[in-house]
C-alpha cells in the first residue's frame, strides 16, 4: 500500500456497524426491496382469499404462517448482523478504552500480525476492511446489503439471515403458484362452457 493511501486510510472515519450514517445505496435498496416483497406477498394473499376453496385457504394459511416466521427472523437477524461490531478484539479494546496503540496486553503468539492502518497487533485471520476502515476478526467479506463486515461472531447470524430470505422467497413463489392454480381452475369451467 502506498504511503499516501495509508495516510488517507488512517484519517478516514471507522464504521463500527452498518447503522452508521450515511447508509450505502445498496443498503437502501435492500430495505426497500424487503418492504416491497412483503407488500407483494400481502397483495397476493388478498387476491387468493377472494376466490379460494377450503383446501387453498388451508394451504395459504400454512404458507402465510411460514412467511410470517421467515419475515420476523429476517428482520431480527438482519438487525443483529447490521448492528454487530466484528472488530478484532485488540482493536475493539483499544478503541473502547481510548488507549494509545499497542498498550493493551496481548499474547505475542496469538497476535503475531500487525495492521499498519489500525497501528496494532491483530489475530492471524483478521483482515482490514477498506470500506469500514477497521480490522475485522475472521473476516469473510464486506456485505453491501447490510453495510457491515461479515465474519467472526456475526457469521452465524448472517447465514440465518440468508436462510430467512431464502424461505421468504420460496414461500412467495409457492404462494404465486397457488394463485395461478386458482386462477386456472376458475377459468377452466368457463372455457368448457364455451365449447358446449
Residue map of PLM features:
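Intracellular leaflet-associated regions of eukaryotic membrane-associated proteins
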Residues: 1-196
Amino acid at each position: 500500500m502506498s504511503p499516501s493511501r495509508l495516510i488517507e486510510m488512517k484519517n478516514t472515519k471507522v464504521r463500527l456497524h452498518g447503522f452508521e450514517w450515511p447508509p450505502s445505496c445498496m443498503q437502501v435498496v435492500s430495505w426497500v426491496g424487503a418492504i416491497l416483497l412483503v407488500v407483494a406477498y400481502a397483495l397476493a394473499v388478498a387476491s387468493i382469499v377472494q376466490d379460494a376453496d377450503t383446501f387453498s385457504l388451508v394451504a395459504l394459511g400454512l404458507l402465510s404462517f411460514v412467511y410470517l416466521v421467515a419475515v420476523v427472523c429476517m428482520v431480527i437477524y438482519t438487525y443483529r448482523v447490521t448492528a454487530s461490531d466484528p472488530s478484532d478484539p485488540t482493536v475493539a479494546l483499544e478503541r473502547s478504552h481510548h488507549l494509545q496503540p499497542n498498550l493493551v496486553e496481548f499474547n505475542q503468539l496469538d497476535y503475531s500480525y500487525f495492521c499498519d492502518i489500525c497501528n496494532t497487533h491483530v489475530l492471524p485471520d483478521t483482515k482490514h476492511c477498506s470500506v469500514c476502515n477497521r480490522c475485522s476478526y475472521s473476516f469473510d467479506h464486506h456485505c453491501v446489503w447490510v453495510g457491515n463486515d461479515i465474519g467472526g461472531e456475526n457469521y452465524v447470524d448472517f447465514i440465518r439471515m440468508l436462510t430467512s430470505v431464502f424461505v421468504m422467497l420460496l414461500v412467495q413463489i409457492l404462494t404465486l403458484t397457488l394463485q395461478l392454480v386458482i386462477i386456472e381452475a376458475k377459468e377452466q369451467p368457463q372455457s368448457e362452457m364455451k365449447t358446449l
